[in-house]
C-alpha cells in the first residue's frame, strides 16, 4: 500500500512537471535561468554575486523542469515567468520594486532577486522578478517602463542570457565611470549631487517577508552623511566632466536626526539612503512624471543639492543651494541659493547678502560640467551668509579668489593644456638631446629652461602630472649641464696634452738637431785634423827630398 502511495505521488509530480512544460510553451527562459544564468551569475561573468545568491532562501519552484522530484512541499507549483527589470538606481530596494509592481495591478510576484557586486555589496541596477502568469508579465513589460523609480524609468526584458550580458556590461561601464570620477572612496557628500552612482549602499533585494529587519544600506557614506532624496518634480543634475575634487559641504539629516559634525565617520547603516541620481541617457533636468515614491522622509525645507553642475571630489566646492519647500507634484518655482545647514545664513525669503566674490574672477560657464558656483553665471547670493569683504582695490597680495579663479577648469581645457605641456616637454627634450649630441650645449640648456618656464606658467602647473614633466625636464637639464662641464674639462685636457706633445716633439727635434750639429762638427774637425796631418806629411816628405838632393 505504501508503494502504491509512493507511485501515486511520483506520478503526480511528474504529471505536474509535464503540465508545466506544456504551459511554458515558448518560455524556456525559466530553465535557462535555473540551469545557466544562475551559475553564470555566481561563478562566471559576475563572481561577486556568489555570496549574496548563496544566502538567499530557496526560491519557489527552483526545481521545476530539472527532472528530479521535489522533496519539499511548495506552496506554489504552477506557472512561473521570469523577467529582468533594469535601469534601477543602486539604492532601489525590493520593497520599492514590489510596490511599483503592485501599483500596476500585478499581485502574483513569486520572487525578486537583485544582482549585486560581491566586492562592496552594491546593486548592479537590475533584478530578476518572477511572476505567476503570462498576463502579469505582459502588463509589467507594457506598463512598468512608464512608471518612475527614484527618478528613472525601469527597463523590463525577458529572462535570457543576452539581456543578462547587456545588463552586466551596463553595470560595469557605470562602475568604471564612477571610479574614473573619483567616487570610490565615500558616499555622496551632502549639499551636492554626485556625478555618477554614489558608492553608498542600497537595501539588498529580498523575498517579501523572507528576511526580517529594516532596509540595509551597506558601504560608507560621504563626510557628514548622505542628504535626503530630491523632492518630487525634480531630478538630480547631469554628471560633471571636470577633474576629481574634494566633496562639498555635508547635507542635512532627515527630521528627527541629529546633525553630525563635518567630516564625521559613516553614519548608521540603514537610517538614511543616498539621494537618487540621473541615470546615463536620461535628459538633463527632466522632471519625474509621477509622485514621490515611498521611502525616506522628504528633505528639510530650504536645503538640498545645488541646481548647477555638482562639484567633483577635488577643488573648491561650489555653494549648495536648496529647493524651495513644496508638496510632491510638478516642478515648482525657480531654484534659489541658500547656505548649507551647518553654517548661518538668511532664512528662506529674506533678502540675499551681497556677493562675496568679484564676478570678474569667475570664467564664463561652459557646457562641460564645470564645477563653478553656478552654470548660469556668478552666484547671486553669498552661500555662507558672510558680509561682503573689504575691498582691497589694486593694492596688496591677491586673496583666495585668485586661487579659485585658476582651479575651475573643465576636463576638455585641462586635457588640452596637459597635451600642450606634454608636447612642449617631449619636443624640448628631443631637441636638447640632438643639440647636445653635436656639442651645442648652450642651445640645449636654453631649450630646456624655456620649456620648464612655460610648463610652470600654465594653469595646471600644480597638477602631479605637470610636476612629473617638470622633474623630467630638470633631470635632462642637469644631465646636459654636467655633460657640458665634463666636455669642457676634457677639451682643456686635450689641449694640454696637445701642448705637451708639441713641446715634446719640439724638444726631440731640437735634441736631434743638436746631436746632428755636434756630429757634423766633430766630423769636420776630424777631417781638418786629417788634412793637417796630410799637409804635415807632405812637408816632411818635401824636406826629406831636399836633404837628399843636397847630399848628392
From Swiss-Prot:
Residues 405-552 are annotated as: Necessary for RNA-binding. Residues 81-161 form the RRM domain. GO terms for molecular function: exon-exon junction complex binding; mRNA binding; ribosomal large subunit binding. Residues 169-411, 479-552 are annotated as: Disordered. The keyword RNA-binding applies. Contains an Arg/Ser-rich domain composed of arginine-serine dipeptide repeats within the C-terminal region that is necessary and sufficient for activating mRNA 3'-processing and alternative polyadenylation (APA). This is Cleavage and polyadenylation specificity factor subunit 6. It comes from Pongo abelii (Sumatran orangutan).
